[in-house]
Amino acid sequence: MSIIDTRTPDSKHFISGVTGDWEVIIGMEVHAQIISNSKLFSGASAKFGAEPNNHVSLIDAAMPGMLPVLNEECVRQAVRTGLGLKARINLKSVFDRKNYFYPDLPQGYQISQFHYPIVGEGKIIISVGPDSNGQFEDIEVGIERLHLEQDAGKSMHDQHPTMSFVDLNRSGVALMEIVSKPDMRSSDEAKAYMTKLRTIVRYLGTCDGNMDEGSMRADVNVSVRRPGEDFGTRCEIKNVNSIRFIGQAIEYEARRQIAILEDGGVIEQETRLFDATKGETRSMRSKEEAHDYRYFPDPDLLPLEFDQAFVDSLAADLPELPDAIKARFVKEMGLTVYDASILVTEKAIADYFEEVAYGRDGKIVANWVINDLLGALNKDNREIEESPVSPNQLGSIIDLIKEGTISGKIAKDLFEIVWNEGGDPRQIVEERSMKQVTDTKAIERAVDEIVANNADKVAQAKQKPALAGWFVGQVMKATGGKANPQTVNELVKMKLGID
């Protein structure tokens, strides 16, 4: 099958070599573990983290005479994912045996889909940026296919000095292999693609996307070429398990290939591993072709067939996906594309934001959620589900500002109190006398005192109006940050005689 080049060479993606510019070409095969109680062809639990070999059925262990029975929930999840990727759903697909020997593959073959996958071509729109002008670039990355397959077990080589052990808990767990087209031209695009794909499957509830647990991992295909020339020979970097490592692996591998070609060498098609400690890729084995696996239809499984009504019923029940939510946030709440993009990265964040924003100014709420809430969560290494500040509490803080009860500065202090101690924000403001001073005469007395004690700066302020900010700061300090900032600003300018 010929590969179509969908992108026009763009100099901002070129990599400078000794002999001229090069372009990196990237495609990805992502293995996403399906959220399901049981495995693809057996009733054994698919739950992560059990003691070795506790979630193994006779089918998973490949005992003689054991026949696979397809898990319908896994089929539903694959179709839902395909719909989320705007892909063609194939009403008929076929399971094949992919034959190879490895200790953690007790059958001697993997049940996969080669010729007739359950999902055909689709697409993902990724946003890369912002650039120096604050603009984002939307890029379409094609999806070639999505197919169902079994995961293998896990070989462990560090448990004994002379023996290796095998854990079959993962053997037979349902995977979706999502294959992109070679449409990415930089490590940033590849990271954005993986981030977006993970976000989509999490919104759909078809994969938890926990890369640290191995439930989502990527095989990254990298090649380089002179801009405008045919695709070069690709190398596959296997099982990269973090978005940061995907970027590092691509950067290293592209430079490695360029160095070889500029020295007059040839790129060998091979499978490589990424060493996260050294930040480099190293050779694993020569890359297999499809014929090496001797694919043929699995005689124990009938072709998988369903009707359009089955697909339509699943489509009708899909949740609102991140692109649609982002567009709604921009259109209905007036958010910037940047802010909306941050808020939809996780469904829980979008849900939190919407709960706080209901009946309030979306821009103000977005500012608090992105800068204060997410900043505090990141500092404490917590997920939003663990936030000590609930949507109701944050909403109350924002309401207190709007009502003029507290200033923005006091609100920051109040947020910190609620974060560390909990409690009702309104009650805290009353009990701790945190209300801002709105009495104009009291504020005016404070302004008069600061002006009277700083005659030299008053004269300077008439020449440099920006010095008014210093006076505002001194008044706020004198009032313990409780004076209404707008009133202070107006009175300072009036007393200094500046516009």
Swiss-Prot record:
Coiled-coil ranges from the UniProt annotation: none
SUPFAM superfamilies attached here? Answer: GatB/YqeY motif, Glutamine synthetase/guanido kinase
Q: What class of enzyme is it?
A: ligase
For this protein, the Enzyme Commission number is: 6.3.5.-
Presence of keyword Nucleotide-binding: yes
Q: Which reaction does it catalyse?
A: L-glutamyl-tRNA(Gln) + L-glutamine + ATP + H2O = L-glutaminyl-tRNA(Gln) + L-glutamate + ADP + phosphate + H(+); L-aspartyl-tRNA(Asn) + L-glutamine + ATP + H2O = L-asparaginyl-tRNA(Asn) + L-glutamate + ADP + phosphate + 2 H(+)
Annotated GO biological process? glutaminyl-tRNAGln biosynthesis via transamidation; translation
Q: Which GO terms describe its molecular function?
A: asparaginyl-tRNA synthase (glutamine-hydrolyzing) activity; ATP binding; glutaminyl-tRNA synthase (glutamine-hydrolyzing) activity
Q: Which InterPro entries does UniProt cross-reference here? A: Asn/Gln-tRNA_amidoTrfase_suB/E, Asn/Gln-tRNA_Trfase_suB/E_cat, Asn/Gln_amidotransferase, Asn/Gln_tRNA_amidoTrase-B-like, GatB, GatB_C_1, GatB_Yqey_C_2, Gln-tRNA_amidoTrfase_suB_CS
Kindly state which keywords UniProt assigns to this record, in alphabetical order.
Answer: ATP-binding, Ligase, Nucleotide-binding, Protein biosynthesis
Q: Does the keyword Flavoprotein apply?
A: no
Q: Name one Pfam family in it.
A: GatB_N
Q: What the protein does? A: Allows the formation of correctly charged Asn-tRNA(Asn) or Gln-tRNA(Gln) through the transamidation of misacylated Asp-tRNA(Asn) or Glu-tRNA(Gln) in organisms which lack either or both of asparaginyl-tRNA or glutaminyl-tRNA synthetases. The reaction takes place in the presence of glutamine and ATP through an activated phospho-Asp-tRNA(Asn) or phospho-Glu-tRNA(Gln).
Binding partners and assembly: Heterotrimer of A, B and C subunits.
Query: What family is this?
Result: Belongs to the GatB/GatE family. GatB subfamily.
Protein name in the entry? Aspartyl/glutamyl-tRNA(Asn/Gln) amidotransferase subunit B
